[in-house]
Design a protein with these regions (language model features):
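Formylglycine-dependent sulfatase
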Residues: 1-172
């Protein structure tokens, strides 16, 4: 779980995140992580590959992710994990299944907040509703289907990217 916007305990004292706090307490936390390029796609490419941008080839939001890249999903897959990439990809306008993953459900480019077309394993699939709810549902389904064996899911949310358009339930 990469959860950078809310912070855990204390960054925004009024924001209660008990589940994130529990994950942080029971998992691994990187409290001082830095990026070499402060854009979402280059940062995502570094996270996926563990390589600086001048080595992984993604230097801006328009550059497609090199399909032959070795990702953490590639390595986990080789170790027997079933892997998935779900949600915001946005490295160029790249279509198709995500490199190193057994399963992908993501959208092209910035996508849309509502009724965003999702590509499931490269197949365009209409969706209904707020995009982060839709991608969360894909992630939950994947985890339920694979709960009896090792799996790894990377889920990228759109909501942290402008222009901001929260779901109806959060507008009041």
């Amino acid at each position: 779980v990469v959860q950078r916007e809310q912070g855990e305990r204390g960054r925004f004292p009024w924001l209660r995140t008990p589940h994130m706090d529990r994950l942080a307490a029971e998992g691994v936390r990187f409290r001082n992580a830095y990026v070499t390029l402060p854009l979402c796609a280059p940062s995502r490419a570094v996270f996926l590959t563990g390589r600086y941008n001048h080595l992984n080839g993604v230097a801006n939001n328009r550059t497609p992710f090199p399909a032959d890249s070795v990702t953490h999903s590639t390595l986990l897959r080789a170790a027997g994990y079933t892997t998935a990439y779900i949600g915001k990809w946005h490295m160029g306008n790249q279509s198709g299944k995500r490199p190193g993953c057994d399963y992908s459900a993501s959208f092209i480019g910035q996508g849309r907040y509502v009724d965003c077309p999702i590509e499931v394993n490269g197949v365009p699939t209409p969706s209904k509703g707020w995009v982060d709810d839709v991608t969360t549902d894909y992630a939950i389904r994947f985890m339920r289907e694979h709960r009896d064996r090792p799996f790894a899911v990377m889920l990228g949310y759109k909501a942290t990217h402008g222009p901001f358009d929260p779901p109806e339930r959060a507008r009041e």
